[in-house]
């Protein structure tokens, strides 16, 4: 039910003071003036509160239960982050304020930038991108500017592995590049022979995630970096899986030239589902001049914004409207410290491998052996045996109060789950997940129709995904 459906004529939730201004005129063009009142819902304050409180109770989140969504790092977000972000000194400031009145905010962003550079092994960083994919596009635009600045106009291609995030080829195409996909080797990693076949002087960038989306560390990364640089290409790091290597190694040490981060993954800020988010981009020295404006700089003991960067790719958004997300990430890093971040990465890998062994007794692991922070399993055998698909198992997990893992991704594994437990989950939680998964597999063999009909206990049962994609409804249809 939408809020429009509980609207009643004459109900009021807020009252404006009387307008004492008698003579005024609205200096707007005629075509911008409304011809009728907006059709806002007429509801009381208690109606609004109850409506949205009831809706929120139907949500599932990391504060409710286990959320093993692979490649998403759904770790628990410590509440101290929220406490600090709610300080009035942070929450009540405005982008239009004079710089001298927001020195604390500018210092926080400057220090966050410096910390992220240290963590990733980059030389400079921008905090402007408002999400991971936005950062990804920013990084690709920087690479384009770099090649064009050298008069190198023949570089029109970006290489991505077949296990890459879908945003990688999308960002490359949006920036005007052709995308070359290379097949993974039998071990799930980049096949150097396949890479060598397509790597030439027309390639601008190689985009990689390390560990990759199969949860495997690209052990040949130094060789890949050398191959890229020998051909004049840049090496781009998708930071989706940075959590696994915190304190152990850094993208910059592996030979990457550009990094984008997802603060909502590694650095414990909320998954905004559309915003606000934050996708900082780090670069090596030779690319720093291309970073977007404005850049946060420190001049003596003062902080300000610098717009004077002639070779910058320019503006990629207007304001730091997602500042509170940066406050949360800053708080998390400061709270954890170097040792704490390293421990988090170690525990993420330990939890993933513990759960991998548990799950391997129930379903096949796509690429057996030690994984990093996540692993990919497949129920293809069960599907052939019973007709129960990964989607059915995912829906049945919801009945047991557990969010389903990522499914059907990467695309190179069939009927698969990508499972990432993160470091914040206990052994008890992992054991419980494995027990429930085993129970569902037994249900699938004994009563497949039961699993195919799931979920049964959720506020909304199976959605019509096809209709939602092809015939989306974006607005309420009023009855005339």
Swiss-Prot record:
Pfam families: GcvP2_C (PF21478), GDC-P (PF02347). The modification N6-(pyridoxal phosphate)lysine is found at residue 265. InterPro entries: GcvPB, GDC-P_C, GDC-P_N, GDC_P, PyrdxlP-dep_Trfase, PyrdxlP-dep_Trfase_major, PyrdxlP-dep_Trfase_small. Gene3D superfamilies: 6.20.440.10, Aspartate Aminotransferase, domain 1, Type I PLP-dependent aspartate aminotransferase-like (Major domain). Its cofactor is pyridoxal 5'-phosphate. The keyword Phosphoprotein does not apply. CDD domains: GDC-P. It catalyses: N(6)-[(R)-lipoyl]-L-lysyl-[glycine-cleavage complex H protein] + glycine + H(+) = N(6)-[(R)-S(8)-aminomethyldihydrolipoyl]-L-lysyl-[glycine-cleavage complex H protein] + CO2. PANTHER family: GLYCINE DEHYDROGENASE (DECARBOXYLATING), MITOCHONDRIAL, GLYCINE DEHYDROGENASE, DECARBOXYLATING. NCBIfam families: PRK04366.1. This is Probable glycine dehydrogenase (decarboxylating) subunit 2. The gene is gcvPB.
């Amino acid at each position: 039910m939408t809020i429009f459906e509980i609207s009643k004529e004459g109900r009021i939730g807020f009252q404006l003071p009387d307008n004492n201004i008698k003579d005024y005129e609205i200096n707007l063009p005629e075509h911008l003036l409304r011809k009728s009142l907006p059709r806002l819902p007429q509801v009381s304050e208690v109606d609004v509160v109850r409506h949205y409180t009831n809706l929120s109770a139907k949500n599932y989140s990391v504060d409710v239960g286990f959320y093993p969504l692979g490649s998403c790092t759904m770790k628990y977000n410590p509440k101290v982050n929220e406490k600090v972000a709610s300080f009035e000194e942070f929450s009540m400031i405005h982008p239009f304020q004079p710089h001298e009145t927001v020195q604390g905010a500018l210092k926080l962003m400057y220090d966050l930038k410096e910390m992220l550079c240290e963590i990733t092994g980059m030389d400079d960083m921008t905090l402007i991108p408002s999400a991971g994919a936005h950062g990804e596009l920013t990084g690709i635009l920087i690479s384009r500017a770099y090649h064009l600045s050298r008069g190198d106009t023949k570089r029109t291609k970006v290489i991505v592995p077949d296990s890459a995030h879908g945003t990688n080829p999308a960002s490359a195409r949006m920036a005007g590049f052709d995308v070359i996909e290379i097949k993974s080797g039998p071990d799930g990693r980049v096949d150097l022979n396949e890479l060598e076949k397509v790597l030439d002087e027309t390639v601008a960038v190689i985009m990689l995630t390390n560990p990759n989306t199969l949860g495997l560390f690209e052990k040949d990364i130094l060789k890949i970096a050398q191959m890229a640089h020998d051909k004049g290409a840049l090496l781009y790091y998708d930071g989706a899986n940075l959590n696994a290597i915190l304190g152990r190694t850094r993208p910059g040490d592996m030979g990457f030239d550009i990094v984008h981060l997802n603060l909502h993954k590694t650095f414990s800020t909320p998954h905004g589902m559309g915003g606000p988010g934050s996708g900082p981009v780090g670069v090596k020295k030779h690319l720093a001049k291309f970073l977007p404006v404005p850049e946060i700089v420190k001049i003596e003991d003062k902080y300000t914004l610098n717009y004077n960067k002639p070779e910058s790719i320019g503006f990629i958004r207007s304001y730091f409207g997602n500042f509170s997300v940066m406050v949360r990430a800053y708080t998390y890093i400061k709270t954890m410290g170097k040792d704490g971040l390293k421990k988090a990465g170690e525990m993420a890998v330990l939890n993933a491998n513990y759960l991998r062994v548990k799950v391997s007794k129930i379903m096949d692991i796509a690429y057996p052996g030690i994984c990093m922070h996540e692993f990919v399993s497949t129920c293809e055998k069960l599907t052939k045996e019973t007709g129960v698909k990964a989607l059915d198992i995912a829906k049945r997990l919801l009945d047991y109060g557990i969010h389903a893992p990522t499914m059907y991704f990467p695309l190179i594994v069939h009927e698969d789950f990508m499972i990432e437990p993160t470091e914040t989950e206990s052994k008890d939680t992992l054991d419980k997940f494995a027990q429930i998964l085993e129970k569902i597999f037994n249900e699938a063999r004994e009563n497949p129709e039961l699993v195919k009909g799931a979920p049964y206990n959720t506020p909304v049962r199976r959605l019509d995904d096809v209709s939602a994609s092809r015939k989306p409804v974006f607005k309420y249809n009023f009855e005339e």
